[in-house]
């Protein structure tokens, strides 16, 4: 019996270290930021079994066999569709402003199409304005309505959107809605989805979360885009979920969420449409490619139209493109750079680009909420404040709610608006969307909103920051340790 237990112990010991060695090799063979690799290795060695389970659940980007197969099957059709779109040469811009040209060159190289011109873009600065505008456009829809949101929650003005969708479906408009399973889990416990499906709306739960899928697909990979498409002509995107902030997370203690959206008319809606079609087919297996732009209704030739590029991220899209675009925009800045984000946990490359911009004389401002709904992110973000404050970056802490707006404005000319947070999850993992707009008037509108945020904020100075308690510094560093995983 003693021999049996001895052999069993040695076999356990052997397989244990074989498992650790195998997972270590797997971690090292995946290309990722060094800080992320080191963090995973430390977790695996400090908490071996827990670390191994956590790594296979959250450490690798895998969609699941079914979605991978859908993506593989549809890619040739997407490529063919893009080639057809390129034949509409009059919709593509040939010239950009000096500050915008580098980012448009980058995105054209990585995505295969240039920016599109002749768009009409309106900045919607409150959730009330955004929800009312969406409802009006739904009421006027004739052909199709497509939406994707991370969070959908009933209450307030969202009920008007829902009722408008139901009435649109009843009059024959094709309605397809996709919402994230984790972000909208409370909504799926209500009769809301069933009510819309009964009206003829296709309502899909994206990236479903349950115990049986835990090891089949990465659970923290989320559908974080916010897109509305109407009649292949009108589109919306931005930071707002399908929620009325007066009824959303009122017990979180952070105040109402503050968001912006952009309403767009023109060929940019077609480029958003192919992204939605990709997501829909990956989730359902159904193919609904958008039609090419209609020459009779698209405002191609408007001299004052906005030049726009859409950047998408997530599995199946060009890797790291949103981070590359952000860094390119930052290095293009010569006078002014203003950024708003609810979660500031940047990669080292992004943090260094921001600091370098300030050190070379650019007026850099970052606006973040004083309080947000994530304990880890709140403290991890503060670990970056010393570096950027010492470089001369102005840090403003928004006092009037949870500032959820994700925006970038460069030199009063280049703007970026979308769903992307300045954290590792948005930059490296989730399905995200950002629109890049090369237009002085739009940048002026955005800067007015950003400076309104600053007026409702408190500036954090380096002297004040260095006086924070020692335990705060310890907590910041502990949370910073996990920043590559946030």
Curated annotation (Swiss-Prot):
Membrane topology of this protein: Multi-pass membrane protein
Membrane spanning stretches: 3-23, 38-58
A GO MF label: cardiolipin synthase activity
GO BP, one annotated term: cardiolipin biosynthetic process
UniProt EC number: 2.7.8.-
Enzyme kind, highest EC tier: transferase
Record's catalysed reaction(s): 2 a 1,2-diacyl-sn-glycero-3-phospho-(1'-sn-glycerol) = a cardiolipin + glycerol
Lineage: superkingdom: Bacteria
Record function comment: Catalyzes the reversible phosphatidyl group transfer from one phosphatidylglycerol molecule to another to form cardiolipin (CL) (diphosphatidylglycerol) and glycerol.
Annotated family: Belongs to the phospholipase D family. Cardiolipin synthase subfamily. ClsA sub-subfamily.
Official protein name in the record: Cardiolipin synthase A
Native species: Proteus mirabilis (strain HI4320)
Organism taxonomic ancestry: Bacteria, Pseudomonadati, Pseudomonadota, Gammaproteobacteria, Enterobacterales
């Amino acid at each position: 019996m003693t021999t049996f237990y001895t052999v069993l112990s040695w076999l356990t010991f052997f397989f244990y270290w074989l498992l650790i060695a195998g997972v270590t090799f797997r971690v090292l063979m995946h290309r990722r930021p060094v800080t992320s690799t080191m963090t995973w290795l430390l977790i695996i060695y400090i908490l071996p079994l827990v670390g191994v389970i956590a790594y296979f659940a959250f450490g690798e980007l895998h969609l699941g066999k079914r979605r991978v197969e859908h993506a593989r099957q549809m890619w040739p059709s997407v490529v063919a569709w893009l080639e057809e779109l390129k034949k509409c040469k009059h919709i593509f811009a040939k010239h950009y402003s000096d500050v915008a040209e580098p980012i448009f060159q980058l995105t054209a190289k990585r995505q295969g199409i240039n920016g599109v011109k002749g768009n009409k873009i309106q900045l919607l600065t409150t959730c009330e304005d955004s929800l009312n505008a969406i409802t009006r456009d739904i009421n006027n829809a004739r052909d199709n309505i497509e939406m994707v949101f991370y969070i959908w929650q009933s209450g307030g003005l969202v009920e008007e959107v829902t009722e408008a969708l139901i009435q649109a479906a009843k009059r024959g408009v094709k309605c397809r809605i996709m919402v994230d399973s984790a972000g909208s889990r409370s909504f799926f416990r209500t009769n809301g989805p069933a009510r819309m499906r009964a009206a003829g709306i296709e309502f899909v739960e994206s990236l479903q979360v349950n115990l049986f899928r835990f090891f089949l697909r990465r659970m923290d990979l989320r559908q974080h885009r916010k897109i509305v498409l109407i009649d292949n002509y009108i589109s919306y995107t931005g930071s707002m979920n399908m929620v009325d902030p007066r009824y959303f997370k009122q017990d979180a203690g952070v105040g109402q969420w503050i968001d912006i959206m952009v309403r767009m008319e023109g060929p940019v809606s077609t480029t958003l449409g192919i992204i939605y079609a990709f997501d829909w087919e990956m989730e359902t297996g159904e193919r609904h490619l958008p039609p090419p732009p209609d020459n009779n209704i698209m405002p191609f030739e408007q001299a004052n139209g906005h030049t726009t590029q859409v950047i998408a991220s997530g599995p199946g899209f060009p890797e790291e493109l949103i981070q590359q675009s952000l860094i390119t925009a930052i290095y293009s800045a010569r006078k002014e750079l203003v950024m708003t984000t609810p979660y500031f946990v940047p990669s080292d490359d992004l943090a260094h680009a921001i600091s370098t911009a300030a050190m070379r004389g650019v007026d850099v401002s970052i606006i973040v909420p004083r309080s947000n709904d994530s304990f880890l992110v709140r403290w991890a973000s503060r670990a970056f404040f010393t570096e950027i404050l010492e470089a001369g970056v102005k840090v403003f802490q928004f006092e009037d709610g949870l500032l959820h707006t994700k925006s970038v404005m460069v030199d009063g000319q280049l703007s970026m608006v979308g769903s992307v947070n300045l954290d590792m999850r948005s930059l490296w993992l989730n399905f995200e969307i950002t629109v890049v707009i090369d237009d002085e008037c739009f940048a002026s509108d955005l800067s007015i909103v950003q400076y309104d945020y600053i007026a409702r904020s408190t500036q954090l100075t380096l002297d004040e920051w260095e006086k924070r308690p020692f335990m705060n510094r310890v907590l910041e560093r502990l949370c910073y340790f996990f920043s590559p995983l946030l």
